[in-house]
């Protein structure tokens, strides 16, 4: 009987310890607004999105929203999978 309690204790302990180190992969989307009325090009949006992203954010798509904005979309890895205005759709990995 003591062995089964010990086994149960070890299983619960390992689950608690492993859950503390979960990493989340989150999709993010943000728009870049232009200061002047420019006609955004594919290259301009790509450059603007790369400048906007931090080191831990991978860009997988950029597109035009309208004549004054580009959309930047990508994936980032974070410790906490809480959605925000920019971060959406987090999955534990």
Swiss-Prot record:
Q: How is it modified after translation?
A: Contains 3 disulfide bonds.
Q: Which residues form a coiled coil?
A: none
Identify the keywords attached in UniProt to this record, alphabetized: Disulfide bond, Secreted, Signal, Toxin
Report the subcellular localization: Secreted
Keyword Secreted tagged = yes
User: A GO molecular function for this record?
Assistant: toxin activity
Q: Which tissues is this chain's protein expressed in? A: Expressed by the venom gland.
Residues spanning the signal sequence: 1-22
Q: What is its main location?
A: secreted
The entry's protein name is U-scoloptoxin(15)-Cw1a
Q: Which organism is it from?
A: Cormocephalus westwoodi
The upper taxonomy is: Eukaryota, Metazoa, Ecdysozoa, Arthropoda, Myriapoda
